[in-house]
């Protein structure tokens, strides 16, 4: 394929639109499947502590395959990598529909998601460049946010009607993503012929980890984003447990509506951060991180739906304002030291490790019988203290 086809394609080309459609359907399936499978666990009388374990097996796949998925994406045509990854997601969702253990099926979806992540971002730079690339990234993020909102709500609403119907809808979304991938042009592999020795691949990946960890700015960013996304995924599961206790509502849809408010808030907060924070003033985002924990603690004490919606919207806004500058800092500094792709891969490992740790602690708290409201208050206070400690540590590092 010619270089002109690879780099000067319009963002409205068939290939680019196919990527965006595939991303929307794949992300829709991911978010709908989570809530549909949680509803299945409830219907089959799994214990409450098993709910976060479901996400832990998904996250575990990300961690296990982190050293390898970047090279896989670069060694083959990325559109085909995306298609195979969505095929794995389809197989996992279909398996759950057909009665296999939901944890086994969800693990398969996690493996597909781990392989899909570096390919979906990497292909944008192969389909377009320059200002068009910025717009393409914007389209990708917009489709992802839309999929999170619609997928989360659809999963909960459909599960209230019929759990199997909700699971079938997820499988159909993944099938649509596979079909959309077929319309992506088969581009030349970015880095073919790399060594497939597992020891060499692992050493290369962890070498990048060491480089980023030794740099004060990138270490600060890795810890901050890890804490944020670990807290975010834990909050998702806390809402499922908290809603029946605090609000007396037992359906599957209400937690998804509340989660959607967080996503809307993140969009607003991210926009504010883009205007108010630069790489030189990243520390401006830290008070927002501390306030996230404070507001989570206040939210946990609510017993009415309207203030719950308002506080979750505020949590999302604070979250978007907090995490976007940290992401930008890591991408900019990481690009110069280990390359943008390696920086993102290391960040994914850090974020998913934090998710695994926080979900494990949350599962343990539920297992020993800590009330949902108490978990929420403790979670908020600990998060605020962790971000405050990170801020103090960063200021001391900067003064040396």
UniProtKB/Swiss-Prot annotation:
**Keyword list, A-Z:** Cell inner membrane, Cell membrane, Lipid transport, Membrane, Transmembrane, Transmembrane helix, Transport
Q: How does it sit in the membrane?
A: Multi-pass membrane protein
The answer to whether keyword Transport applies is yes
What CDD domains does UniProt report for this protein, alphabetically?
MFS_MefA_like
Pfam families in alphabetical order: MFS_1
Kindly list the GO CC terms recorded for this protein. plasma membrane
- Localization annotation: Cell inner membrane
- Sequence intervals crossing the membrane: 19-39, 53-73, 91-111, 139-159, 164-184, 195-213, 227-247, 257-277, 281-301, 304-324, 352-372, 373-393
Q: Which GO terms describe its molecular function?
A: lysophospholipid:sodium symporter activity
Annotated function: Catalyzes the facilitated diffusion of 2-acyl-glycero-3-phosphoethanolamine (2-acyl-GPE) into the cell.
Protein name (record): Lysophospholipid transporter LplT
Tell me the organism: Salmonella paratyphi B (strain ATCC BAA-1250 / SPB7)
Lineage, opening ranks:
Bacteria, Pseudomonadati, Pseudomonadota, Gammaproteobacteria, Enterobacterales
